[in-house]
Amino acid sequence: MSNSPEVLIHPSACVDPGCTIGSGTRVWHFSHVMAGASIGRDCTIGQNVFVAAGAKIGNHVKIQNNVSVYDGVELEDEVFCGPSCVFTNVKNPRSEVSRRHEFLATRIRRGASLGANSTVICGADLGRYSLVGAGAVVGGQHPDYALLIGVPARQVGWVSRHGHRLQARDGGGNLLCPESRFRYLENPGGTLTCLDHPEDQPLP
């Protein structure tokens, strides 16, 4: 295990030699981090979380209780995984057929949030700051700031970087976050851009 001395690991957690955990990260009760897993700085790994070899977790990620992050899953910086959300890594699993060579990559991009008990089908690519509602089942590719709900999940609107549904507009027709007052421009082709803060920069 390659760790900074500032890492907090609960005595009941199992952290295998050969994983990497960044400074300021906390690994809580009964969690298991396998050799080959990579976890960034200042993350929270909740109770009963499994992080597989080959899983990649960025900085400032929060993973709530009872989540398994499998090989092939990448969580970029600032991602939030709600309690008991689920990742898959093959589309047609069988106990008697090995499909380890068929694992599909799943990417959850910067700042996205996965609601409690949501399921992410392998191969999904969820855009920055998108939000998946509790209990939704989501697959495929979705844009930044998409609000996704239902089974199967569908996009029903947009959310701001602060997590609010965007409905109000300013005088120029841009969507307006009720908390930050950041403005968002709807682009041709079904994408959204924040006009007041770069998407790849931390909030002030």
What are the residue ranges of the model-derived segments?
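Short, intrinsically disordered terminal segments enriched in charged and Pro/Gly residues
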Residues: 194, 198-204
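Cys/His-enriched microdomains
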Residues: 155-158, 173-175
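Short, non-ligating residues that shape and space the ligands of small metal-coordination modules
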Residues: 168-169, 183-187
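Short cysteine/histidine-rich zinc-coordinating motifs and their immediately flanking basic loops
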Residues: 171-177, 188-195
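Flexible, glycine/small-residue-enriched loop-and-beta-strand segment within the central core
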Residues: 2-11, 16-21, 26-126, 151, ...
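Short, intrinsically disordered, charge-biased short linear motifs at domain edges
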Residues: 135, 144-150, 159-169
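Short cysteine-rich clusters marking metal-coordination/redox-active sites
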Residues: 160, 177-180
